[in-house]
Protein backbone atom coordinates (compact mmCIF):
# COMPACT_ATOMS: atom_id res chain seq x y z
CA UNK A 1 0.00 0.00 0.00
CA UNK A 2 1.48 3.34 -1.08
CA UNK A 3 1.46 5.83 1.77
CA UNK A 4 1.60 9.53 1.10
CA UNK A 5 1.57 11.73 4.16
CA UNK A 6 0.38 15.32 4.29
CA UNK A 7 0.67 18.07 6.89
CA UNK A 8 -2.22 20.16 8.21
CA UNK A 9 -1.52 23.08 10.53
CA UNK A 10 -3.91 23.85 13.38
CA UNK A 11 -4.97 27.29 14.58
CA UNK A 12 -2.35 27.14 17.35
CA UNK A 13 0.43 26.16 14.94
CA UNK A 14 0.65 22.41 15.56
CA UNK A 15 1.46 20.32 12.49
CA UNK A 16 -0.68 17.20 12.15
CA UNK A 17 0.36 14.37 9.84
CA UNK A 18 -2.48 12.78 7.90
CA UNK A 19 -2.91 10.35 5.04
CA UNK A 20 -5.55 9.11 2.64
CA UNK A 21 -5.90 5.63 1.15
CA UNK A 22 -8.55 3.65 -0.70
CA UNK A 23 -11.59 4.57 -2.76
CA UNK A 24 -15.29 4.79 -2.02
CA UNK A 25 -17.41 6.88 0.33
CA UNK A 26 -15.25 8.95 2.67
CA UNK A 27 -14.59 7.72 6.20
CA UNK A 28 -12.46 9.79 8.58
CA UNK A 29 -10.95 8.18 11.66
CA UNK A 30 -10.27 10.52 14.56
CA UNK A 31 -6.88 10.13 16.21
CA UNK A 32 -6.65 7.63 19.05
CA UNK A 33 -4.12 6.04 21.35
CA UNK A 34 -1.82 5.15 19.83
CA UNK A 35 -0.98 5.36 16.15
CA UNK A 36 1.92 6.02 13.82
CA UNK A 37 0.88 6.54 10.20
CA UNK A 38 3.95 4.86 8.75
CA UNK A 39 4.19 1.96 11.19
CA UNK A 40 0.48 1.07 11.20
CA UNK A 41 0.29 -0.04 7.56
CA UNK A 42 2.19 -3.31 8.09
CA UNK A 43 1.39 -3.62 11.77
CA UNK A 44 0.22 -6.99 13.19
CA UNK A 45 -2.06 -4.96 15.48
CA UNK A 46 -3.40 -2.14 13.27
CA UNK A 47 -2.66 -3.41 9.75
CA UNK A 48 -5.97 -5.24 9.22
CA UNK A 49 -7.89 -2.13 10.31
CA UNK A 50 -6.09 -0.08 7.67
CA UNK A 51 -6.60 -2.71 4.96
CA UNK A 52 -10.30 -3.17 5.69
CA UNK A 53 -11.11 0.53 5.82
CA UNK A 54 -9.01 1.30 2.74
CA UNK A 55 -10.76 -1.48 0.81
CA UNK A 56 -14.25 -0.06 1.34
CA UNK A 57 -13.72 3.65 1.89
CA UNK A 58 -11.82 6.76 0.94
CA UNK A 59 -10.05 6.43 4.28
CA UNK A 60 -8.56 9.47 6.02
CA UNK A 61 -6.62 9.18 9.29
CA UNK A 62 -4.09 11.21 11.25
CA UNK A 63 -1.68 11.04 14.17
CA UNK A 64 -2.71 13.13 17.15
CA UNK A 65 -0.66 16.05 18.42
CA UNK A 66 2.33 14.76 20.35
CA UNK A 67 2.41 11.37 18.60
CA UNK A 68 3.62 9.55 15.53
CA UNK A 69 4.49 11.76 12.56
CA UNK A 70 2.66 14.80 13.97
CA UNK A 71 4.49 17.41 16.05
CA UNK A 72 5.97 15.59 19.05
CA UNK A 73 6.82 18.60 21.22
CA UNK A 74 3.52 20.36 21.89
CA UNK A 75 2.69 22.71 24.74
CA UNK A 76 -1.07 22.17 24.86
CA UNK A 77 -2.60 18.70 24.50
CA UNK A 78 -5.81 19.51 26.36
CA UNK A 79 -9.18 18.12 25.32
CA UNK A 80 -10.26 21.49 23.97
CA UNK A 81 -8.12 20.84 20.88
CA UNK A 82 -9.65 17.48 19.95
CA UNK A 83 -12.49 18.95 17.90
CA UNK A 84 -10.31 21.61 16.29
CA UNK A 85 -7.67 19.07 15.25
CA UNK A 86 -10.30 16.88 13.60
CA UNK A 87 -11.78 19.92 11.83
CA UNK A 88 -8.31 20.90 10.62
CA UNK A 89 -7.65 17.52 9.00
CA UNK A 90 -11.10 17.35 7.40
CA UNK A 91 -10.61 20.81 5.93
CA UNK A 92 -7.14 19.90 4.64
CA UNK A 93 -8.56 16.77 2.99
CA UNK A 94 -11.07 18.99 1.12
CA UNK A 95 -14.00 16.75 1.99
CA UNK A 96 -17.15 18.34 0.59
CA UNK A 97 -19.77 15.59 0.93
CA UNK A 98 -21.21 14.07 4.12
CA UNK A 99 -18.75 11.52 5.50
CA UNK A 100 -18.64 8.67 7.97
CA UNK A 101 -16.69 9.26 11.18
CA UNK A 102 -14.93 6.49 13.10
CA UNK A 103 -13.97 7.07 16.71
CA UNK A 104 -11.94 4.38 18.45
CA UNK A 105 -11.49 4.64 22.22
CA UNK A 106 -11.03 8.32 23.11
CA UNK A 107 -11.35 9.18 19.40
CA UNK A 108 -15.05 8.73 19.98
CA UNK A 109 -15.20 11.93 22.02
CA UNK A 110 -13.71 13.92 19.12
CA UNK A 111 -16.20 12.39 16.68
CA UNK A 112 -19.13 13.06 18.99
CA UNK A 113 -18.16 16.71 19.34
CA UNK A 114 -17.79 17.01 15.56
CA UNK A 115 -21.14 15.33 14.88
CA UNK A 116 -22.87 17.72 17.28
CA UNK A 117 -21.16 20.78 15.80
CA UNK A 118 -21.56 19.72 12.13
CA UNK A 119 -24.46 17.24 11.83
CA UNK A 120 -25.01 18.13 8.18
CA UNK A 121 -21.49 16.89 7.36
CA UNK A 122 -21.79 13.47 9.02
CA UNK A 123 -23.58 10.62 7.25
CA UNK A 124 -22.67 7.91 9.78
CA UNK A 125 -21.05 7.95 13.22
CA UNK A 126 -19.23 4.76 14.29
CA UNK A 127 -17.88 4.43 17.83
CA UNK A 128 -15.77 1.44 18.85
CA UNK A 129 -14.48 0.90 22.40
CA UNK A 130 -15.54 4.45 23.21
CA UNK A 131 -16.50 6.23 26.37
CA UNK A 132 -18.02 9.46 27.64
CA UNK A 133 -16.25 9.34 31.03
CA UNK A 134 -12.53 8.96 31.61
CA UNK A 135 -11.11 6.58 34.20
CA UNK A 136 -10.82 9.18 36.95
CA UNK A 137 -14.34 10.46 36.28
CA UNK A 138 -15.79 6.95 36.59
CA UNK A 139 -14.42 6.83 40.13
CA UNK A 140 -14.13 3.88 42.51
CA UNK A 141 -12.09 0.90 41.33
CA UNK A 142 -11.75 2.39 37.85
CA UNK A 143 -10.10 5.52 39.24
CA UNK A 144 -7.72 3.50 41.43
CA UNK A 145 -6.75 1.34 38.48
CA UNK A 146 -6.20 4.38 36.29
CA UNK A 147 -4.00 6.09 38.88
CA UNK A 148 -1.85 2.95 39.02
CA UNK A 149 -1.48 2.95 35.24
CA UNK A 150 -0.48 6.63 35.27
CA UNK A 151 2.16 5.91 37.90
CA UNK A 152 3.61 3.04 35.87
CA UNK A 153 3.80 5.27 32.81
CA UNK A 154 5.54 7.97 34.85
CA UNK A 155 8.10 5.54 36.25
CA UNK A 156 8.95 3.35 33.31
CA UNK A 157 7.66 4.41 29.88
CA UNK A 158 11.04 5.49 28.53
CA UNK A 159 13.10 2.62 29.96
CA UNK A 160 14.93 0.28 27.61
CA UNK A 161 13.54 -2.55 29.73
CA UNK A 162 9.97 -2.92 28.41
CA UNK A 163 8.55 -4.27 31.70
CA UNK A 164 6.32 -1.26 32.41
CA UNK A 165 5.16 -0.96 28.81
CA UNK A 166 4.33 -4.67 28.76
CA UNK A 167 1.77 -4.12 31.51
CA UNK A 168 0.18 -1.45 29.33
CA UNK A 169 0.35 -3.67 26.24
CA UNK A 170 -1.21 -6.63 28.02
CA UNK A 171 -4.31 -4.55 28.76
CA UNK A 172 -4.77 -3.59 25.10
CA UNK A 173 -4.07 -6.98 23.49
CA UNK A 174 -4.35 -9.56 26.31
CA UNK A 175 -4.52 -12.51 23.90
CA UNK A 176 -1.95 -11.25 21.41
CA UNK A 177 0.85 -13.35 19.93
CA UNK A 178 4.48 -12.67 20.86
CA UNK A 179 4.85 -10.76 17.59
CA UNK A 180 1.83 -8.59 18.33
CA UNK A 181 2.88 -7.91 21.92
CA UNK A 182 6.46 -7.08 20.93
CA UNK A 183 5.23 -4.81 18.15
CA UNK A 184 2.86 -2.93 20.46
CA UNK A 185 5.62 -2.54 23.05
CA UNK A 186 7.86 -1.01 20.42
CA UNK A 187 5.03 1.17 19.11
CA UNK A 188 4.62 2.62 22.60
CA UNK A 189 8.29 3.56 22.73
CA UNK A 190 8.58 4.92 19.19
CA UNK A 191 5.27 6.77 18.93
CA UNK A 192 5.29 9.02 21.96
CA UNK A 193 7.86 10.38 24.43
CA UNK A 194 7.47 9.39 28.12
CA UNK A 195 6.39 12.83 29.34
CA UNK A 196 3.92 13.22 26.47
CA UNK A 197 2.46 9.75 27.10
CA UNK A 198 1.71 10.73 30.69
CA UNK A 199 0.19 14.07 29.70
CA UNK A 200 -2.07 12.49 27.08
CA UNK A 201 -3.28 9.77 29.43
CA UNK A 202 -4.01 12.29 32.17
CA UNK A 203 -6.16 14.35 29.79
CA UNK A 204 -8.11 11.27 28.71
CA UNK A 205 -8.69 10.23 32.30
CA UNK A 206 -10.65 13.43 32.99
CA UNK A 207 -12.91 13.33 29.93
CA UNK A 208 -16.59 13.86 30.71
CA UNK A 209 -19.00 14.46 27.82
CA UNK A 210 -22.03 12.61 29.19
CA UNK A 211 -24.19 15.74 28.98
CA UNK A 212 -23.44 16.09 25.25
CA UNK A 213 -24.70 12.66 24.19
CA UNK A 214 -28.43 13.51 23.85
CA UNK A 215 -27.46 16.26 21.39
CA UNK A 216 -26.28 13.79 18.73
CA UNK A 217 -28.59 13.84 15.71
CA UNK A 218 -26.81 11.59 13.21
CA UNK A 219 -27.12 7.81 12.60
CA UNK A 220 -24.86 6.18 15.19
CA UNK A 221 -23.42 2.69 15.58
CA UNK A 222 -21.77 1.81 18.90
CA UNK A 223 -19.61 -1.32 19.10
CA UNK A 224 -17.81 -2.60 22.18
CA UNK A 225 -15.92 -5.74 23.21
CA UNK A 226 -17.84 -7.48 25.99
CA UNK A 227 -14.79 -8.16 28.18
CA UNK A 228 -12.71 -5.12 27.21
CA UNK A 229 -10.09 -4.63 29.94
CA UNK A 230 -9.26 -1.04 28.98
CA UNK A 231 -12.74 0.49 28.64
CA UNK A 232 -15.53 -1.50 30.34
CA UNK A 233 -18.47 -2.48 28.17
CA UNK A 234 -20.74 -0.52 30.50
CA UNK A 235 -19.27 2.65 28.98
CA UNK A 236 -20.28 1.50 25.50
CA UNK A 237 -23.77 0.77 26.73
CA UNK A 238 -23.89 4.20 28.32
CA UNK A 239 -23.08 5.78 24.95
CA UNK A 240 -25.72 3.73 23.13
CA UNK A 241 -28.43 4.42 25.69
CA UNK A 242 -27.84 8.19 25.78
CA UNK A 243 -27.38 8.83 22.04
CA UNK A 244 -30.84 9.02 20.41
CA UNK A 245 -31.63 5.86 18.39
CA UNK A 246 -28.05 4.59 18.44
CA UNK A 247 -27.48 0.97 17.43
CA UNK A 248 -25.42 -1.13 19.85
CA UNK A 249 -23.37 -4.20 18.94
CA UNK A 250 -21.65 -6.12 21.74
CA UNK A 251 -18.71 -8.13 20.41
CA UNK A 252 -17.47 -11.39 21.93
CA UNK A 253 -13.92 -10.37 22.76
CA UNK A 254 -11.70 -9.36 25.69
CA UNK A 255 -9.49 -7.20 23.47
CA UNK A 256 -9.65 -3.41 23.23
CA UNK A 257 -7.92 -3.41 19.83
CA UNK A 258 -9.63 -6.21 17.89
CA UNK A 259 -7.16 -8.59 16.26
CA UNK A 260 -7.50 -10.05 12.77
CA UNK A 261 -7.95 -13.70 13.85
CA UNK A 262 -10.95 -13.00 16.08
CA UNK A 263 -14.54 -13.79 15.07
CA UNK A 264 -15.34 -10.45 16.71
CA UNK A 265 -13.25 -8.70 14.05
CA UNK A 266 -15.32 -10.27 11.28
CA UNK A 267 -18.48 -9.17 13.07
CA UNK A 268 -17.06 -5.66 13.35
CA UNK A 269 -16.35 -5.62 9.61
CA UNK A 270 -19.83 -6.84 8.78
CA UNK A 271 -21.53 -4.37 11.13
CA UNK A 272 -19.62 -1.43 9.66
CA UNK A 273 -20.29 -2.50 6.07
CA UNK A 274 -24.00 -2.91 6.68
CA UNK A 275 -24.35 0.26 8.73
CA UNK A 276 -22.66 2.37 6.07
CA UNK A 277 -24.20 0.52 3.12
CA UNK A 278 -20.96 -0.61 1.46
CA UNK A 279 -20.30 -4.09 0.04
CA UNK A 280 -23.67 -5.67 0.58
CA UNK A 281 -23.75 -9.44 0.86
CA UNK A 282 -23.96 -10.77 -2.72
CA UNK A 283 -25.51 -14.01 -1.51
CA UNK A 284 -28.58 -12.26 -0.12
CA UNK A 285 -31.79 -13.39 -1.84
CA UNK A 286 -32.93 -10.99 -4.54
CA UNK A 287 -35.40 -8.42 -3.27
CA UNK A 288 -34.45 -8.94 0.38
CA UNK A 289 -32.97 -5.91 2.11
CA UNK A 290 -30.12 -6.36 4.62
CA UNK A 291 -30.84 -6.17 8.31
CA UNK A 292 -28.80 -3.75 10.38
CA UNK A 293 -26.86 -5.11 13.39
CA UNK A 294 -29.59 -3.84 15.70
CA UNK A 295 -32.35 -5.40 13.58
CA UNK A 296 -30.53 -8.74 13.68
CA UNK A 297 -30.27 -8.44 17.45
CA UNK A 298 -33.98 -7.67 17.76
CA UNK A 299 -34.80 -10.63 15.54
CA UNK A 300 -32.72 -12.90 17.79
CA UNK A 301 -34.60 -11.61 20.83
CA UNK A 302 -37.91 -12.24 19.05
CA UNK A 303 -36.89 -15.85 18.52
CA UNK A 304 -36.16 -16.08 22.25
CA UNK A 305 -39.76 -15.08 22.94
CA UNK A 306 -38.98 -11.67 24.42
CA UNK A 307 -41.71 -9.04 24.69
CA UNK A 308 -41.22 -5.52 23.32
CA UNK A 309 -40.57 -4.27 26.85
CA UNK A 310 -37.92 -6.94 27.43
CA UNK A 311 -36.30 -6.18 24.07
CA UNK A 312 -36.22 -2.47 24.88
CA UNK A 313 -34.47 -3.17 28.18
CA UNK A 314 -31.96 -5.51 26.54
CA UNK A 315 -30.79 -3.04 23.89
CA UNK A 316 -31.30 0.20 25.82
CA UNK A 317 -33.99 1.80 23.64
CA UNK A 318 -37.64 2.75 24.10
CA UNK A 319 -40.55 0.43 23.31
CA UNK A 320 -41.61 2.87 20.60
CA UNK A 321 -38.22 2.52 18.94
CA UNK A 322 -38.50 -1.26 19.23
CA UNK A 323 -41.83 -1.15 17.38
CA UNK A 324 -40.32 1.02 14.66
CA UNK A 325 -37.37 -1.33 14.21
CA UNK A 326 -39.60 -4.40 14.15
CA UNK A 327 -41.75 -2.82 11.45
CA UNK A 328 -38.58 -2.42 9.40
CA UNK A 329 -37.60 -6.04 10.09
CA UNK A 330 -41.01 -7.32 8.96
CA UNK A 331 -40.80 -5.26 5.78
CA UNK A 332 -37.31 -6.48 4.95
CA UNK A 333 -38.21 -10.11 5.61
CA UNK A 334 -41.43 -9.83 3.63
CA UNK A 335 -43.63 -10.88 6.55
CA UNK A 336 -46.66 -9.33 8.22
CA UNK A 337 -46.20 -10.01 11.92
CA UNK A 338 -44.08 -11.29 14.78
CA UNK A 339 -44.99 -14.96 14.36
CA UNK A 340 -44.13 -14.96 10.66
CA UNK A 341 -40.83 -13.20 11.39
CA UNK A 342 -39.89 -15.86 13.95
CA UNK A 343 -40.68 -18.64 11.47
CA UNK A 344 -38.71 -16.91 8.70
CA UNK A 345 -35.72 -16.31 10.97
CA UNK A 346 -35.74 -19.93 12.10
CA UNK A 347 -35.81 -21.18 8.53
CA UNK A 348 -32.94 -18.89 7.56
CA UNK A 349 -30.87 -20.03 10.54
CA UNK A 350 -31.44 -23.70 9.73
CA UNK A 351 -30.42 -23.09 6.14
CA UNK A 352 -27.26 -21.34 7.30
CA UNK A 353 -28.18 -18.11 5.54
CA UNK A 354 -29.28 -15.93 8.43
CA UNK A 355 -27.39 -12.75 7.58
CA UNK A 356 -24.11 -14.60 6.92
What positions do the PLM features span?
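Conserved HGGG/HGGXW glycine-rich cap/lid loop of the alpha/beta-hydrolase fold
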Residues: 7-69
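Short beta-strand/loop motif that positions the catalytic acidic residue
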Residues: 216, 222-224, 228
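Acidic catalytic loop of the alpha/beta-hydrolase fold
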Residues: 227-231, 257
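Flexible "cap/lid" loop of the alpha/beta hydrolase fold
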Residues: 112, 116, 123-155
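Conserved alpha/beta-hydrolase catalytic His-Asp/Glu region
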Residues: 158-203, 212
